[in-house]
Amino acid sequence: MADIYRFPKFSYEDNGTVEPLPLRTGSDKKAIPYIRIIKVGDPPKHGVRYLDLLLLGFFETPKQTTNLGSVSDLTEPTSYSICGSGSLPIGVAKYYGTDQELLKACTDLRITVRRTVRAGEMIVYMVDSIGAPLLPWSGRLRQGMIFNANKVALAPQCLPVDKDIRFRVVFVNGTSLGAITIAKIPKTLADLALPNSISVNLLVTLKTGISTEQKGVLPVLDDQGEKKLNFMVHLGLIRRKVGKIYSVEYCKSKIERMRLIFSLGLIGGISFHVQVTGTLSKTFMSQLAWKRAVCFPLMDVNPHMNLVIWAASVEITGVDAVFQPAIPRDFRYYPNVVAKNIGRIRKL
């Protein structure tokens, strides 16, 4: 059983909404490119910006033609059929130009894709035709990038392995960063287990503008009967002194003194940002890697939910602090469903 503290609405109402990507088609029945920029923190209104970019689009394969070997093969452009949708995160860089220049440079990219496997299924991106607006990101684009397939492709099983695949960019998600930089809690700190401690987790409730059931993301009904989605992130631990039991009221007062502000960004699709504007203990600060602003990309927290809602309207409708006993150190984490060194199963 856990105790819950509900944050007041003003802590997330200012920047807790993301507008949807408009899906409009032109005369050729193709989606019209669009760039969506959202601000996190207090970025400058003009001039140089730090932008985190996520390219959204479709995986396509060449259509099979019946007139192979004819002269028209050399004169007519190759037509493609869509085999899936996905994204390409290219990270943060300092950008000087306009949004429309950036959009055109992104849609002009020639991106080839390969589906492969390591410990899990992966998507390999190889990029050509990098225009001038994208030069700040060119170091990553030229090297090629590999991502977990379940994080960047809605249905990786639909990508053929025996055909050429291209990734056609249609939409660009940008997060303009101000004083708040992108800082993630290191995994070693997020997995930290301390005796006699209380784990502070955040339960984030969202409302989206699309129906998610058919894509495998089941909503829950709130007290008013509205469909909502939710996910949890770990913020840190409140350490109790030996022999002393901290009350729920004490934990709530510690959280209230932090004066947390929440917002949504577009890093990796949808991202949840936490900013500390109040007082923070040294113990808690060390668990946040000495940062007063941290980012939780939904791509890492709940990849499938992120894939389903990253183009939709998203709004924070509630944030709760959940106080739970910290998981004991002697509990073992099993990342694999196959138990090692049991019977005939041996670790290689």
Swiss-Prot record:
InterPro entries: Matrix_C, Matrix_N, Matrix_Paramyxo_C, Matrix_Paramyxo_N. GO terms for molecular function: structural constituent of virion. A motif (YLDL motif) lies at residues 50-53. A large portion is phosphorylated in the cytoplasm, but not in virion. However, this phosphorylation is not essential for virus replication. The modification Phosphoserine is found at S70. Acts as a negative regulator for transcription and replication by sticking to the nucleocapsid. This effect might be regulated by the cytoplasmic interaction with tubulin that dissociates the M protein from the nucleocapsid. Plays a crucial role in virion assembly and budding. Forms a shell at the inner face of the plasma membrane and concentrates the HN and F glycoproteins. This is Matrix protein. It comes from Sendai virus (strain Harris).
